[in-house]
């Protein structure tokens, strides 16, 4: 039986993408993940995550979805972040099931739930994959929990790959934009980068999530200044 873990990295930052990853492995091989020292990606160093990512990609089956800031900005005009995440989670799950050509079988899917209502999150996710369940005659057990990345090795694996992938993207951004900080809205370096960029270019960078309060504050401040000048 195949087990799948799904998690994301970069849900909260004001800069950069959200990376969603589904990781699958045969249930009887789950012990191999524990032997690798797989755990919550936030407890691992950046170098350790990068090292484990390579090992995990060779050990199991991986499907990723990278939602750049521009796509998140566009999607948030019509749906909220939870819906964006559920859509991405269901997409990687379905892609992985198709890639592995799983039919007439049992699957367990473990998810790190973003919503405060884990049951609602679980039901929404199941609705999104209902078509592939029927089409392929699958018996699927879904476990959606908070901090699943700290409880289930298969989710930890997905978390590590997603986080390491995002680390690489942020490093690339730093080569282009300079010191952008951590990308989190509470980071003074990130706030300064956004303010300085806006001051110089009269717009926010493409890597900024415009629906976040940090960006809205900069845009609102600019509008108020313009009104005062006029």
From Swiss-Prot:
Bilayer-crossing regions: none
Cofactor binding mode and count: Manganese or magnesium. Binds 1 divalent metal ion per monomer in the absence of substrate. May bind a second metal ion after substrate binding.
UniProt effect for mutating residue 7 to N: Reduces activity 800-fold
Pfam families: RNase_HII
Entry annotated with the keyword Hydrolase: yes
Effect on the protein of changing residue 8 to Q: Reduces activity 700-fold
Keywords: Cytoplasm, Endonuclease, Hydrolase, Magnesium, Manganese, Metal-binding, Nuclease
EC numbers for this chain: 3.1.26.4
CC cofactor: Mn(2+); Mg(2+)
Major subcellular site: cytoplasm
Compartments where found: Cytoplasm
RNase H type-2 domain: residues covered: 1-224
Keyword Nucleotidyltransferase in annotation: no
Reaction catalysis annotation: Endonucleolytic cleavage to 5'-phosphomonoester
NCBIfam families per the UniProt record, alphabetical: ribonuclease HII
The protein, known as: Ribonuclease HII
Organism: Methanocaldococcus jannaschii (strain ATCC 43067 / DSM 2661 / JAL-1 / JCM 10045 / NBRC 100440) (Methanococcus jannaschii)
Annotated gene: rnhB
């Amino acid at each position: 039986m195949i087990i799948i873990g799904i998690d994301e990295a970069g849900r909260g930052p004001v800069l950069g993408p959200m990376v969603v990853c589904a990781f699958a492995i045969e249930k009887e091989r789950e012990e191999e993940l524990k032997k690798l020292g797989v755990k919550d990606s936030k407890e691992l160093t950046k170098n350790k995550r990068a090292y484990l990512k390579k090992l995990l990609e060779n050990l199991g089956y991986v499907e990723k979805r990278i939602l750049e800031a521009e796509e998140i900005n566009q999607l948030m005009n019509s749906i909220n972040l939870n819906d964006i995440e559920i859509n991405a989670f269901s997409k990687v799950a379905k892609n992985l099931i198709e890639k592995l050509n799983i039919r007439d079988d049992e699957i367990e899917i473990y998810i790190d739930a973003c919503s405060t209502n884990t049951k609602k999150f679980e039901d929404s996710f199941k609705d999104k994959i209902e078509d592939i369940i029927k089409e392929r005659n699958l018996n699927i057990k879904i476990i959606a929990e908070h901090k699943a990345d700290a409880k289930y090795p298969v989710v930890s694996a997905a978390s590590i790959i997603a986080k390491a992938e995002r680390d690489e993207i942020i490093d690339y951004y730093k080569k282009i934009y300079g010191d952008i900080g951590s990308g989190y809205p509470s980071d003074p370096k990130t706030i300064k980068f956004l303010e300085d960029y806006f001051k110089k270019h009269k717009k926010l960078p493409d890597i900024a999530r415009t629906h976040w309060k940090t960006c809205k504050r900069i845009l609102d401040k600019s509008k108020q200044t313009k009104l005062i000048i006029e």
